[in-house]
């Protein structure tokens, strides 16, 4: 969940976020 959480926290779109590994 590191990449997913980081991108969501950074304000990036969830669609562009990596897979919730």
Curated annotation (Swiss-Prot):
Keyword flag Secreted: yes
Cellular compartments annotated: Secreted
Name of the protein: Bradykinin-potentiating peptide K12
Gene Ontology CC: extracellular region
Molecular function terms from GO: peptidase inhibitor activity
Family that this chain belongs to: Belongs to the non-disulfide-bridged peptide (NDBP) superfamily. Scorpion BPP (group 1) family.
Function summary: Inhibits angiotensin-converting enzyme (ACE), but does not serve as substrate for the enzyme. Potentiate bradykinin (BK) on the isolated guinea pig ileum as well as the isolated rat uterus for contraction. Also potentiates in vivo the depressor effect of BK on arterial blood pressure in the normotensive anesthetized rat. Intracerebroventricular injection into mice does not show toxic activity.
Keyword annotations from UniProtKB, A to Z: Hypotensive agent, Metalloenzyme inhibitor, Metalloprotease inhibitor, Protease inhibitor, Secreted
Tissues/organs with expression: Expressed by the venom gland.
